[in-house]
């Protein structure tokens, strides 16, 4: 189900034992600007509440539903958490806040409270979806919450065998480890108004795949009609609406990143899952480099 309200309200979570929350994951059924305007309060007795944080929505376009949103908060230990909402103070809609143009109505599918540190609004910062969010604050993710490079071991070369029967064989130093498996695949977005050419979106970082799509769709106008007339009539191709979601990886992304940014991204790969590394300042800088590389690759194509 979905929690809905047009009037001031709050959602309350109660735990049997004190729980330490470090971030809040907001799950929606569609796009809802109001769900990211919650005021987070905490209490030890369910009577006296203290302010934890006023959530701030990321700047966003209309195609904002591919990923959830994770808001980091100062580490807070409490038995009761309240999430207050009011329509008062809502901003008007704009090109970079499309969802705000609708009448203020709160719609939330889930609120997930997590104890592990994550970068603020990391889903947009890693390029999974177009968003522009506030930087993570040190009071929310401290140095002690960040993994250092010495704590990360790349086990890829120890993962052997065929695709359907690979085996990981590794000897790790003593301690408690987390196994993080990362890969890449299509986002599932398909091209719209494509007629018989409908299918998965092509790799926007690869000039060859973009050229193949162009030659077999738009450029067919030169093949199917009189070429001389087509050359006089069709002089430009204008993209008036980007409706293919986001892309943040392909087979050559790590290579292009190192060539353009001057350092290896692979040791910092956990950042692409929102896991803070070294420091919040360093984490934000590297993810800014990721987004810059994404932009350059699309432009270069």
Predicted regions and their residues:
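Aromatic, loop-rich ligand-recognition surfaces of beta-strand-rich domains
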Residues: 1-49, 53, 67-142, 241
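Short alpha-helical segments and helix-capping/turn motifs at coil-helix boundaries
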Residues: 10, 23-26, 66-70, 96-98, ...
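The substrate-binding groove and active-site-proximal loops of carbohydrate-active enzymes
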Residues: 27, 57-60, 194-216, 240, ...
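Short secondary-structure boundary/capping segments
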Residues: 55-59, 68, 98-99, 128, ...
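Catalytic and substrate-binding clefts that recognize carbohydrates or anionic sugar/phosphate headgroups
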Residues: 85-91, 95-223
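Aromatic- and acidic-residue-enriched carbohydrate-binding clefts of CAZyme catalytic domains
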Residues: 180-202, 250-293
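Short helix-terminating capping/connector loops at secondary-structure junctions
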Residues: 227-234
């Amino acid at each position: 189900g979905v929690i809905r309200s047009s009037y001031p309200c709050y959602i309350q979570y109660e735990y049997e034992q004190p729980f330490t929350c470090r971030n809040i994951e907001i799950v929606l059924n569609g796009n809802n600007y109001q769900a990211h305007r919650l005021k987070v309060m905490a209490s030890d007795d369910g009577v006296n509440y203290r302010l934890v944080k006023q959530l701030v929505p990321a700047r966003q376009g209309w195609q904002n539903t591919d990923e959830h949103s994770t808001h980091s908060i100062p580490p807070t230990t409490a038995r009761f958490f309240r999430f207050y909402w009011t329509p008062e103070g809502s901003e008007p809609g704009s090109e970079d806040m499309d969802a705000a143009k609708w009448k203020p109505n709160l719609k939330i599918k889930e609120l997930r409270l997590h104890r592990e540190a994550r970068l603020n609004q990391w889903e947009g910062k890693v390029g999974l979806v177009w968003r522009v969010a506030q930087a993570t604050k040190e009071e929310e993710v401290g140095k002690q919450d960040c993994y250092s490079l010495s704590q990360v071991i790349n086990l890829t070369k120890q993962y052997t065998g065929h695709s359907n029967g690979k085996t990981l064989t590794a000897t790790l130093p003593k301690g408690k480890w987390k196994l993080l498996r990362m890969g890449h695949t299509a986002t599932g977005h398909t091209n719209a108004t494509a007629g018989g050419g409908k299918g998965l979106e092509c790799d926007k970082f690869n000039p060859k795949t973009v050229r193949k799509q162009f030659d077999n769709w738009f450029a067919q106008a030169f093949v199917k009609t009189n070429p001389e007339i087509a050359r006089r009539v069709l002089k430009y191709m204008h993209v008036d609406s980007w409706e293919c979601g986001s892309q943040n990886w392909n087979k050559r992304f790590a290579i292009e990143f190192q060539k353009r940014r001057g350092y290896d991204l692979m040791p910092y790969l956990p950042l692409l899952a929102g896991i803070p590394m070294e420091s919040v300042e360093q984490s934000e800088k590297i993810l800014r480099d990721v987004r810059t590389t994404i932009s350059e690759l699309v432009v270069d194509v």
